[in-house]
Amino acid sequence: MKKSVHGCLALFLLASAASATAATSLNALFMTQAAYSESDIRAMTQAFEKANPDVKVNLEFVPYEALHDKIVAARGAGGNGYDVVLFDAIWPAEFTKFNLLQDISSRISAEDKAQIFPGALKTVVFNGKTLGMPWILDTKYLYYNKAMLEKAGIRELPQTWQQVMDDARIIKEKKIVNYPLVWSWSQAEALVCDYTTLVSGFGGQFYQNGKLSFSSPASLQAVKLMKSSLDDGLTNPASREYLEEDVRKAFSNGDAAFALNWTYMYNMANDAKQSKVAGQVGIMPAPGDAPGKAGAVNGSMGLGIASGSTHADQAWQYIRYMTSQPVQNNYARLSLPIWKSSYQDAAVMKDQESLIKAADTSLSVMLSRPETADYSRLSSTLQQQLQQVLTGGATPEAAMQAVDKSAARLR
């Protein structure tokens, strides 16, 4: 009997020790498109796990187009679902309505908030709730091929979208490249981001007297420019099927003189190992309709804790690490840091002076896409109608009126 008691006690102590040393397992959802690469996120996570051996992070990567639906579909999974998710600036209204993310307002100190760019914080806040930490501070820039512009005899950078089109026409006429412009116009959120960049540059907003409006002069001007650039042979028609990576590859291959894309393309297009135009890449704020004006879309994203997570403290520990200033500074070549003082760091600035100069202008004029709990439905309609225009199936006026009608029915 004594041996039996001692045996049970030993087993209990072994089980307790095993329980005490067992790592908490987190499930984290990321995307495989733009900003940080999958290999970079894995490297960040491995460093976190090394510093925190009691936490194990299981990573899942999906295309951006699948990210939203993955988060929504997992809401009933409870502790078996995701703990940490990457979310876009356009989803907080919907995620608040359906309680998909935990409010972490109490976890972020006032000191941290003061050190983060306001535009980045806005990405994760809705109706007074903070749904995560900003992680990707991003917008779209106008990239240009310096060698092509020089060969065309273009000595000054375009200051307006009209000048971009004029320069593109010169480049085409001189047969330097067949299609000087390339965009992300596939029927996806990328199309909405390009459209929003143009609307911003033309001085537009999406709300008129508190109501959504897509038939404003700025909106119609944006859509007409998109269509005319195709009709005039300036935009590569394949743009209607392109996402951001397609744009990067086309530009890096020397198949375009101008491209609209996120931050991550700057250093990748300047990398001789994966680009034929390394050293020829220029970057500037997307222009507007008058010299001195710029346009930009808020393409920032945050990391949040799923409502069903049973490991909120460890999830926050991981998020805090991933969004920390040292980690962001170390990976600043693919996504600029959310921390203000990072831009005084010589390592962050190195070889990125042109990018950061452009960011200084663009990040201050970012236009947010409409904040509505029904954003996914609205975006789907907008994508469809824009594609109708780009393929010649509808006029800009008719297409945007159709979007207005759909927007009026949103809850």
Label each residue range with its predicted role:
Residues 119, 123, 281-285, 332-384, ...:
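Long, aromatic- and glycine/proline-rich binding clefts that accommodate carbohydrate-like moieties
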Residues 92-100, 120-156, 184-208, 297-306, ...:
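Periplasmic solute-binding protein
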Residues 88-141, 163-167, 179-180, 191-194, ...:
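Hinge/lid segment of periplasmic solute-binding proteins
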Residues 167-170, 174, 211-240, 286, ...:
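Glycine-centered hinge/linker elements that transmit conformational signals in sensory
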Residues 105-116, 180, 185-186, 201-223, ...:
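Short, solvent-exposed loop/beta-turn-alpha elements that line the ligand-binding surface or hinge
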Residues 43, 47-116, 123-125, 150-159, ...:
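Extracytoplasmic "Venus flytrap"/periplasmic binding protein-like
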